[in-house]
């Protein structure tokens, strides 16, 4: 999936990520850009506008939780299916989340990282992160197959 150099570049940048801020923004943007994903978060309260979503403390808290889990997965880049097996089972069997949403969230995360890191987020680094988020999305969707 990733060479040693590609892994190092991903881990180096991710070490600079403020998980709380980036996680909250990524989940918030997912809910704004792809409003049908809101159905999984109706219990979060006010999701009536972009401002409401991006300012919602439950969205921010869950976004942090998601990115904390993503961060843990980065420690197992060679076994993403194993790293995310229990979450795949939860999202498939209990939550019934459309696995396409994992891909969408990964793409939104890449956008947020590009926005936050600007020129430091080179096209090569973007390609490396895209490989990672695709791998994570595939691992989360594994139970569905």
Curated annotation (Swiss-Prot):
Gene Ontology molecular function: any one: haptoglobin binding
- What's in the GO CC field? blood microparticle; haptoglobin-hemoglobin complex; hemoglobin complex
The entry's family comment says: Belongs to the globin family.
* UniProt keywords, alphabetically: Heme, Iron, Metal-binding, Oxygen transport, Transport
Q: What is this protein called?
A: Hemoglobin fetal subunit beta
The UniProt subunit note reads as follows: Heterotetramer of two alpha chains and two beta chains.
To which species is this protein native? Capra hircus
Annotated function:
Involved in oxygen transport from the lung to the various peripheral tissues.
Q: Which residues bind heme b?
A: 62, 91
> InterPro entries from the entry?
Globin, Globin-like_sf, Globin/Proto, Hemoglobin_b, Hemoglobin_oxygen_transport
Highest taxon listed in the record's lineage: Eukaryota
Say yes or no: keyword Cell division present. Answer: no
**Sequence ranges assigned to domain Globin in this UniProt record:** 1-145
**One Pfam family linked to the record:** Globin
Q: Which cysteines are joined by disulfide bonds?
A: none
Q: Name one GO biological process term.
A: hydrogen peroxide catabolic process
Regarding tissue, the record states: Red blood cells.
């Amino acid at each position: 999936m990733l060479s040693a150099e590609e892994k190092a570049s991903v881990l180096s940048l991710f070490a600079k990520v403020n998980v709380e801020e980036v996680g909250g923004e990524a989940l918030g943007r997912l809910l704004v850009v792809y409003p049908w994903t809101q159905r999984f978060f109706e219990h979060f309260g006010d999701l009536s506008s972009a401002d409401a979503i991006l300012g919602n403390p439950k969205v921010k808290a869950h976004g942090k939780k998601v990115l904390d889990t993503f961060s843990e997965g980065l420690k197992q880049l060679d076994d993403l299916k194993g790293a995310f097996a229990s979450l795949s089972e939860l999202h498939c069997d209990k939550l019934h989340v459309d696995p396409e949403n994992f891909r969408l969230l990964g793409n939104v995360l890449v956008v947020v990282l590009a926005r936050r890191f600007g020129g430091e987020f080179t096209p090569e680094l973007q390609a490396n992160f895209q490989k990672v988020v695709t791998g994570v999305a595939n691992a989360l969707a594994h139970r569905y197959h």
